[in-house]
C-alpha cells in the first residue's frame, strides 16, 4: 500500500509540475531576433537551439550548453518515458561534431536529455562539465566522454573558485554557484542531490533530479593563454547572490556576451538588482522562455512566468547594452 501511495504522489507531482510550465501565451506574432551579423568583431558564432541550449563557437572550439533538442509532449513527460529522440537531434549532429565541451547548468531533463546521444557522436577530446548528481544520473549510460565534476570548483560572490582549462588550451570554464527557482509559486520539483550512481538508464522525468546548479564563465583564450572573449551563461536563476562571482575577475576582462534565463530579466523588470546590472555584458541573450512541450514546428508559446512582449519593450528602452530575444535555431555572428 505504501508503494501505491508513493506512486500516486509521484504521478500527481509530475502532472502538476509539467502542466504549470505549459500555460503561457502564444508567441505567434512576437518579433524574435533571428540571424544577425553584427559589428562586434569578436570572431564568435552563437547559435540558440532553444531553452538553455546554446552553441558557442570561437577560436576554433565550440561549447554546447544544456544539450536539449528533444521536445516531448506534456502527457508523455508526465506519464511516459523521457528519452532522446534521434529524429529531433540528428538534424543538428553535423554542426555539433566539433563540440569540445558540454556544460550543464543543472540535472533536470530539459537541460541534459540529449547529452548521452550527442556524446556518442563527439570526438575523443570532448568533455562533459556538470554536477555530481548529473554524473550519478548518467552513470549507467557509460558516457564515452570524460566527465568533469564542478561542485568543488564553484566560485561564489566571495570566493574565486577554480577554472577548468581544456587540454587544447583554447578555452577555460569557471563554474559559479547558482540556484533553481520554484517552477511556479511554491512548486519546486525534483530538487534532490544524488550521491550514488543510478543502476538503470534514466527514462522518467523524476529520474532527473536537480543537483547543484551552476552558472558558467567561459573564456576563449589567445595564444598567450589570456582571455580574449568572455561569455557568461546562467540558464537558471533565483537572483543575486546566486550567479555572482568576485568582481576582481572582471579586472582581467569584462563580459562580452551573456546568455541568461528569463528569471534574470524578470528580476530587473521588477526593480530588483540582477546579474544584468552587476555583471553587464555588451550583448545579452535571453533564454528559457518557451513551452518545450511543443515541437519547433508548432507555434511557440511562452511559459507561465514569462511575458515576452512586455520584456522586449522594457529592454528596448536601454541604450547601455544590447538585448536579444532569439528564436530557436537563430544564429548570430559577433
Which residues are covered by each model-predicted region?
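Active-site HxH/HxHxD metal-binding segment of metal-dependent hydrolases
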Residues: 90-186
Amino acid at each position: 500500500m505504501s508503494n501505491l501511495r508513493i506512486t500516486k504522489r509521484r504521478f500527481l507531482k509530475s502532472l502538476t509540475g509539467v502542466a504549470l510550465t505549459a500555460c503561457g501565451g502564444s508567441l505567434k506574432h512576437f518579433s524574435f531576433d533571428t540571424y544577425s551579423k553584427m559589428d562586434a568583431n569578436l570572431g564568435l558564432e552563437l547559435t540558440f537551439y532553444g531553452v538553455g541550449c546554446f552553441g558557442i563557437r570561437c577560436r576554433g572550439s565550440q561549447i554546447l550548453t544544456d544539450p536539449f533538442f528533444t521536445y516531448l509532449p506534456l502527457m508523455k513527460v508526465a506519464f511516459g518515458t523521457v528519452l532522446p529522440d534521434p529524429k529531433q537531434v540528428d538534424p543538428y549532429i553535423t554542426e555539433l561534431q566539433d563540440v569540445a565541451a558540454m556544460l550543464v547548468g543543472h540535472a533536470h531533463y530539459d537541460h541534459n536529455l540529449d547529452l548521452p546521444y550527442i556524446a556518442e557522436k563527439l570526438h575523443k577530446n570532448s568533455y562533459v562539465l556538470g554536477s555530481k548528481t548529473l554524473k550519478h544520473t548518467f552513470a549507467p549510460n557509460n558516457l564515452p566522454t570524460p566527465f568533469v565534476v564542478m561542485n568543488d570548483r564553484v566560485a561564489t560572490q566571495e570566493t574565486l573558485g577554480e577554472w577548468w582549462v581544456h587540454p587544447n588550451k583554447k578555452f577555460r570554464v569557471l563554474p559559479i554557484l547558482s540556484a533553481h527557482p520554484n517552477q511556479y509559486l511554491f512548486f519546486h520539483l525534483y530538487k534532490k542531490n544524488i550521491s550514488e550512481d543510478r543502476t538503470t538508464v534514466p527514462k522518467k522525468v523524476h529520474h532527473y533530479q536537480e543537483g547543484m546548479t551552476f552558472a558558467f564563465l567561459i573564456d576563449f583564450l589567445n595564444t598567450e593563454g589570456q582571455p580574449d572573449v568572455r561569455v557568461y551563461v546562467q540558464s537558471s536563476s533565483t537572483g543575486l547572490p546566486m550567479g555572482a562571482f568576485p568582481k576582481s575577475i572582471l579586472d582581467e576582462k569584462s563580459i562580452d556576451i551573456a546568455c541568461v534565463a528569463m528569471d534574470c530579466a524578470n528580476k530587473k523588470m521588477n526593480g530588483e538588482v540582477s546579474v544584468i546590472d552587476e555583471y553587464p555584458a555588451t550583448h545579452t541573450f535571453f533564454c528559457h522562455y518557451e513551452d518545450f512541450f511543443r515541437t519547433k514546428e508548432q507555434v511557440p508559446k511562452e511559459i507561465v512566468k514569462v511575458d515576452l512582449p512586455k520584456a522586449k519593450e522594457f529592454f528596448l528602452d536601454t541604450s547601455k547594452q544590447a538585448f536579444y530575444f532569439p528564436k530557436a535555431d537563430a544564429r548570430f555572428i559577433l
